[in-house]
Every structure is written in structure tokens, then in C-alpha cells.
């Protein structure tokens, strides 16, 4: 709002000044300078205005989405608990079934690494 008032005052001052004063090269340069400033100021005011409008829209959207998100969370909480209750025993069972294979793989990997280290020691000696 302040920027709009400032821009309006500058525009009125330029309009009044150009009508009241004779045109000379220096005044023409000053008029161009102020015209450029006016253009930049108007662009800045427009950007600020759009930014404020965007922020307002985002805040309104958040305000509208909060009740919906609360409802979704209320509906999903029992579902998440149910899924966790069903998945936990399955995961534990899978872990018990895979443990022997993992242990065997680990022991074989350790054996291969020992052989590689022994060979590396033999090569460096």
C-alpha cells in the first residue's frame, strides 16, 4: 500500500513537472531517469503485491487443509496399527528363517577374506 502511494505521488509529480517546465536536454534526461525509476518502482510494487497475494493464498490453503489432514490422520491411525500388528510377526518369522542363511553367508565371506589376506601376506613377503 505504501509503495502504491509513493508510486502515485511520483507519477503525479512527473506529470505536473513536465507540464510546468520548459523542455531542455537536462530536464529531458531527468524526466527519462524518473520515468525509469517509476517503471522500476511499479514493477517492484507489482512483485510485492503478487508475493503477498501468493502468501495469502498459501495460508488460506493451509487453513483449509488442516481439518482434512486431521481427519485423514484419524482414519489412518487404526489402519497403521493394524498393519503393524500383522507385519511384525511376519517380519520376525522371516528373520528367523533367514538367519541360518545369513550366518552361513557371513562365515563363508569371512573365510574368503581370510584366504585373500593370507594370499596378500604371501605376496608381500
Swiss-Prot record:
Question: Which UniProt key words apply to this protein?
Answer: Antifreeze protein, Secreted, Signal
Work out whether the entry's keyword set contains Acetylation. Answer: no
Signal peptide stretch: 1-20
Coiled-coil region list: none
GO annotations of cellular component type: extracellular region
Q: Where in the cell is it found?
A: Secreted
Which superkingdom does the taxonomy of this entry point to? Eukaryota
User: What is the protein's known function?
Assistant: Antifreeze proteins lower the blood freezing point.
State the family named in the UniProt similarity comment for this chain: Belongs to the apolipoprotein A1/A4/E family.
What's this protein's name?
Answer: Type-4 ice-structuring protein
Q: Which organism was this protein described from?
A: Gadus morhua (Atlantic cod)
Highest classification ranks of the organism: Eukaryota, Metazoa, Chordata, Craniata, Vertebrata
